[in-house]
Every structure is written in C-alpha cells, then in structure tokens.
Design a protein with these regions (language model features):
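Non-cysteine beta-strand/loop elements that form the S-adenosyl-L-methionine
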Residues: 141
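Portal/gating segments that form or line small-molecule/metal binding sites
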Residues: 1-134, 144-185
Length: 185
C-alpha cells in the first residue's frame, strides 16, 4: 500500500498561510531535501488552492528553465486534485479531478501499486484525510520566524492525533524539517 506524505512550511508560531515568507530560507540544502522527497514519490495529491498556484507556475517556461529537472518531474507526475469547484479538463498536464467522496477516492489511490504520494500544503485536504486515517506522514518545515498572524497549520477543534517523530533534518539556515508518522489508532 502506498502512503501519503504531507510536506508543508510553517512558522515558529504555527502559521502556514501564504508561504512567500519562506523564500529567504531557501538554500541548496533545502532544494536537495525537496528534490529527494519529490523523487521518492510517483504522484502528487493537491487541494484546489495549491493546485491553482502550482498550475500557474510550474508549467511556465520561466519555471521550467529555472528549475530544470525538478520542474520536469512536477509537470510529468500524475496530480490528483481534490475540489468541489474545479471542472474537468484540468489545465495542468496529467491532472485528475477528485470531485466525489474524496476520502474514498484517496483510499482507492492508496491501494494502487507504486511509490508514496506527496501532498504539498493543501491543509484543508490534509485535515479531512487525517480524520479518515489516510495521512501517513507529516513533514513540517519549521522556519525560525514568528509571523504573528495568519492561518495556523492545525485548526482549533481538530481531533487529537498521536504522532511519532521519525526523522529530523536541520538545514544550515535554521529551518528544521520534522517528519512525523501518524501513530496507529
């Protein structure tokens, strides 16, 4: 069974919203970590907001030229997009709409053979899938920055969930990537 790994940026005070604030922390080490996790995956799982942002960037000549094989991989991987408002056909290459019972659709995807699926941010989708026990690992890129306001990674009222720390990676710029597996229920 393939897993679902979430990768998301967060400030020290728990804010994930509009991660443009993370750009000053990008480094060669961060790029290598991002590359490794992308190559360990054979599909992307995205919510509508993340899909729209990525679809507007990754397929452009500018991004392909700048990001090289990383952009090529982002563009070529199958992308499964959870949305109630988007309509098919989706514009970004190899994108598939999950419009019905998303938890059921994702559970079926997990049963397919292959590598793990990677989910960037897509926090509302992450919350919904966590409620159904479908998220396997959460990789939090903790930035040494306090934003003071914005949407938090874990909303009030979310079900208590036990996590097990399985890996930490400290990048030279002070970002710490914390990898947590969802503990057995």
């Amino acid at each position: 069974m393939r897993g679902i790994n979430v990768s998301t940026y967060v400030s020290l005070d728990g804010v994930f919203e509009d991660p443009a604030w993370s750009a000053p922390y990008w480094s060669d080490a961060a790029q290598q970590f991002a590359r490794d996790q992308l190559w360990e995956s054979d599909a992307l799982l995205l919510g509508r907001t993340t899909y729209e942002a990525f679809a507007a960037s990754w397929p452009t000549e500018e991004w392909i030229e700048r990001e090289g094989e990383f952009a090529e991989r982002m563009n070529s991987l199958p992308k499964y997009v959870a949305s109630t408002s988007l309509e098919e056909p989706l514009e970004w290459n190899n994108s598939h709409l999950l419009k019905g019972d998303v938890a059921q659709d994702v559970a079926k995807l997990k049963e397919e053979p292959g590598q793990d699926m990677l989910m960037y941010s897509s926090v509302e989708l992450m919350h919904a899938l966590m409620e159904h026990g479908l998220i396997d690992e959460v990789r939090i890129w903790l930035h040494p920055l306090i934003l003071g306001s914005g949407k938090h990674l874990f909303k009030d009222g979310i079900e208590k969930t036990e996590l097990e720390l399985v890996d930490t990676t400290t990048l030279p710029n002070g970002v710490v990537v914390l990898a947590y597996q969802i503990a057995a229920r």
